[in-house]
Design a protein with these regions (language model features):
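Long, well-structured alpha-helical subdomains associated
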Residues: 8, 38-43, 84-133
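Active-site scaffold of zinc-dependent metalloenzymes
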Residues: 1-43, 54-58
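Histidine-centered divalent metal-coordination motifs
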Residues: 49, 53
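Poly-acidic low-complexity segments
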Residues: 18, 26-30, 37, 64-67, ...
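Post-HEXXH active-site segment of zinc metalloproteases
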Residues: 55-84
Length: 133
């Protein structure tokens, strides 16, 4: 769970970002708020990950692959910069599992319901099968 000391330090270091307890970890670009679950055992890691989204100015995305790219960028920043800066041991396997869940989501989302081939995204939530046409 995120320590009060870490949360207070982040609030002091980033006064333009709100840090608010919530049910899930997430970054809201429109609200300029990092939401965090104060009871999660891996809370400090995920808190820094959501902070990375904020520092990278991540907001909406048009294509699903853009979301996966943003997740990878945020994990890279969490591991390479923020973990050392704030003295948080980031479990890189846990970070990779989190990123893998997005890759799996993208893989499943892009599968053609008729033939199972992965297609190409043409619009926000639409995919076109490269096998079926």
């Amino acid at each position: 769970m995120p320590s009060k000391n870490l949360i207070n330090t982040l609030r002091a270091d980033y006064p333009h970002i709100e840090f608010t307890p919530g049910e899930h970890f997430k970054w809201s670009a429109s609200e300029k708020t990092v939401y965090f679950n104060a009871r999660d055992d891996a809370g400090e890691t995920f808190l820094l990950h959501e902070l990375a989204h904020a520092l990278l100015d991540h907001d909406d995305f048009d294509l699903d692959i853009q979301l996966v790219r943003k997740e990878a960028e945020a994990w890279d920043m969490t591991i390479a910069e923020l973990s050392d800066k704030y003295g948080v041991d980031v479990d890189e396997k846990e970070a990779e599992m989190s990123l893998e869940s997005y890759r799996h989501w993208l893989f499943m989302r892009s599968k053609c319901p008729d033939c199972g081939t992965n297609g190409l995204q043409t619009k926000n939530t639409h995919y076109k099968c490269i096998a079926c046409g």
